[in-house]
Every structure is written in structure tokens, then in C-alpha cells.
């Protein structure tokens, strides 16, 4: 994806030096956007190999409403381990807000159900979206992620926080807003997960997956990722792979990792980098 490499270069070339919550330091730009037509392939980076199993299983986990890392660990995903309590709890993070947003009368709202239903029954609606930014549960920045989770708060606030759908002539496009985007580690995963979700929703609603748009707020590269970014920028993008979904499950919640196949993924070696905690 040429657009992604251009964004990487933009951040390291034009980014302002800033401090951050983790104490690592970043170079950051504000308010960026790129688009990808899914007819041109599945946006899994080819300039470094990505672990598609982690991307798919994390999305499946979030859609299930689960907020404990036990299932992730059992399915080969470790990306949330640093923020969980000793019992694996993350507090009311993504999945709970997506599928069980609390209401004043003690009930909950499933935003994913709303999105699927509206895509099927009123695809011209301008209200087809879901998000995870529930101010009541945002973490106290003076406390650790584990303390926040124990106190009923989110271990981390949502970074990829708002998803909106747009339907035209039977084609589904999705836009994602990311308030805080780690361009080297996080953004490639978020982009692929958005594309996967678009394919899943399109299949469930008998639509054709069309375009994804990623909009980022604080768009940053950590100071300890600069060498890795230079390595990636020196590589040449290859042809993107294709996504095959092998069956149509009964609902958006019934997909399994084995339902997905990435065909023709030819990527350069992965590039290791430390996560800022």
C-alpha cells in the first residue's frame, strides 16, 4: 500500500517532536486520511509480514463482547497481555461498548445489531455507525491499566473508536476514525481489521465490499521505532493478497478464524519493534 508508506514518510519527515503518556517520545502529525478500494486487494501490508491470525481473532473477540484476554491467549493472540490484570481482565473495553452499551434504565444496546439491521433495512441512512468512546468508563490517567480495570474502568481508552458505513448501488464502504494512531505497529492492524469487518458486514447484508477510509487524529511514530520505519520505507510494495471467506455464517458473531483464507500473500519479513506501554 503506497498510501501507507507515504503516511509513514510524512510522519518521520514532518512530524513534531512530542512527549506522550508512555514517556517514550514521538514524532506526530495531526489529522491524516487514506483510502483503499477493496477491489485492488486485501490491505495486508507487503513491506513487512503481518500476523493475520491476530488481526482476525482480535476482531472476532471484540465482536463477541469479550473483554478478557483468556480467549485471545487460547487462540494465539498476545497483543493485549501487557494491559490486563492477573485475571486477564481489561475492564469495559471495545467489545463491551460495541455490544452492550449501558443505558440509564439498566439495560444495554448492541450497536453491532443496530448496524447490521440498518444496513439491511435502511441502507441510505446516515446514522449507520458504532463507537466505543463511553466517557463514563475512560481510564484515570494517573493509574495503571490494571488498576483502572480493577476499578471498573477501561484499561486503555479506545484508539480506533468510530466506524461508519456508507451504501451506494449495493456497495458497502466503511470509514474508521482513530483518535491516536501508532503508525508503525497499530495502524497496519487497524487497516486490515477494518477491511475484514467490511467484508464480513457486506457478506451478512448481501452487499459488495467497496472502499475503506482510515482517518487518524494524533498520528505518531515512537522515537524507538525510527530505525524500523527506515527499514520499511526502503522496501518496495508488492501485489496485495486476496481475502476468501469460505462460508456465510448465520450472523456477524459466528465467524471463526478458519472461515478466512488469505490468498497470494507475498510479504517481506516482519520487523520487530517494542510496544510503548
Curated annotation (Swiss-Prot):
Q: Fetch the InterPro entries from UniProt.
A: Thymidate_synth/dCMP_Mease, Thymidate_synth/dCMP_Mease_dom, Thymidate_synth/dCMP_Mease_sf, Thymidylate_synthase
Family, per entry:
Belongs to the thymidylate synthase family. Bacterial-type ThyA subfamily.
What are the recorded Gene Ontology BP terms? dTMP biosynthetic process; dTTP biosynthetic process; methylation
GO CC annotations, alphabetized: cytosol
Q: Which residues bind dUMP?
A: 21, 126-127, 179-182, 190, 220-222
**Cytoplasm is among the record's keywords:** yes
Pfam families listed in its UniProt record:
Thymidylat_synt
Q: Mention one GO molecular function.
A: thymidylate synthase activity
Binding-site positions, (6R)-5,10-methylene-5,6,7,8-tetrahydrofolate: 51, 182, 276
Q: Which HAMAP family does the protein's record reference? A: Thymidy_synth_bact
The function of this protein is: Catalyzes the reductive methylation of 2'-deoxyuridine-5'-monophosphate (dUMP) to 2'-deoxythymidine-5'-monophosphate (dTMP) while utilizing 5,10-methylenetetrahydrofolate (mTHF) as the methyl donor and reductant in the reaction, yielding dihydrofolate (DHF) as a by-product. This enzymatic reaction provides an intracellular de novo source of dTMP, an essential precursor for DNA biosynthesis.
Q: Which Gene3D superfamilies match?
A: Thymidylate synthase/dCMP hydroxymethylase domain (3.30.572.10)
The record's listing under SUPFAM superfamilies reads:
Thymidylate synthase/dCMP hydroxymethylase (SSF55831)
> Subcellular localization, per the record?
Cytoplasm
Q: What is the lineage of its organism?
A: Bacteria, Pseudomonadati, Pseudomonadota, Gammaproteobacteria, Pseudomonadales
- Protein name (Swiss-Prot/TrEMBL): Thymidylate synthase
Q: What is its EC number?
A: 2.1.1.45
Amino acid at each position: 500500500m503506497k498510501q501507507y508508506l507515504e503516511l509513514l514518510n510524512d510522519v518521520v519527515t514532518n512530524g513534531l517532536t512530542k512527549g506522550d503518556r508512555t514517556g517514550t517520545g514521538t514524532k506526530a502529525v495531526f489529522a491524516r486520511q487514506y483510502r483503499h478500494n477493496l477491489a485492488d486487494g486485501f490491505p495486508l501490508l507487503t513491506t513487512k509480514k503481518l500476523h493475520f491470525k491476530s488481526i482476525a481473532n482480535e476482531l472476532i473477540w471484540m465482536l463477541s463482547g469479550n473483554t478478557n484476554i483468556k480467549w485471545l491467549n487460547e487462540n494465539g493472540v498476545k497483543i493485549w497481555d501487557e494491559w490486563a490484570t492477573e485475571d486477564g481482565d481489561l475492564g469495559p473495553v471495545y467489545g463491551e461498548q460495541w455490544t452492550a452499551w449501558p443505558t440509564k434504565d439498566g439495560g444495554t444496546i448492541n450497536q453491532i445489531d443496530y448496524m447490521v439491521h440498518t444496513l439491511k433495512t435502511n441502507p441510505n441512512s446516515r446514522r449507520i455507525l458504532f463507537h466505543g468512546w463511553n466517557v463514563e468508563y475512560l481510564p484515570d490517567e494517573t493509574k495503571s491499566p490494571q488498576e483502572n480495570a480493577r476499578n471498573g474502568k477501561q484499561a486503555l481508552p479506545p484508539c480506533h473508536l468510530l466506524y461508519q458505513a456508507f451504501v451506494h448501488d449495493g456497495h458497502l464502504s466503511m470509514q474508521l476514525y482513530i483518535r491516536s494512531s501508532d503508525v508503525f505497529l497499530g495502524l497496519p492492524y487497524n487497516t486490515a481489521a477494518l477491511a475484514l469487518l467490511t467484508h464480513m458486514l457486506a457478506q451478512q447484508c448481501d452487499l459488495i465490499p467497496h472502499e475503506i477510509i482510515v482517518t487518524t487524529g494524533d498520528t505518531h511514530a515512537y522515537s524507538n521505532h525510527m530505525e524500523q520505519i527506515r527499514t520499511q520505507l526502503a522496501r518496495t510494495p508488492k501485489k496485495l493478497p486476496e481475502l476468501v471467506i469460505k462460508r456465510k455464517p448465520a450472523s456477524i458473531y459466528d465467524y471463526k478464524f478458519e472461515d478466512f483464507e488469505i490468498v497470494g500473500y507475498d510479504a517481506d519479513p516482519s520487523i520487530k519493534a517494542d510496544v510503548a506501554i
